[in-house]
Amino acid sequence: GVPCLCDSDGPSVRGNTLSGTLWLFGCPSGWHNCKAHGPTIGWCCKK
C-alpha cells in the first residue's frame, strides 16, 4: 500500500515516519483511521 502521515507522526510529511497506509475504501478489519482529517482520496489507516 501507499504510506501516509498519521496524526501521531507529526504535522508534516518532511522528516517524519509515515506509519499509516492509504486505503481507498475505508480501513480494513482490525485497522483504525489514524488521521482526523483524511487525505483527499481514501483513508489513512494503521494496525
Curated annotation (Swiss-Prot):
GO biological process annotations for this chain's record? regulation of signal transduction
- The intrachain disulfides are 4-44, 6-34, 27-45
InterPro entries to which the protein is assigned, alphabetical: Anenome_toxin, Myo_ane_neurotoxin_sf
UniProt-recorded Gene Ontology molecular function terms: sodium channel regulator activity; toxin activity
Q: Which Gene3D superfamilies match?
A: Anthopleurin-A
Family membership noted in the UniProt record: Belongs to the sea anemone sodium channel inhibitory toxin family. Type I subfamily.
UniProt protein name: Delta-actitoxin-Aspp1d
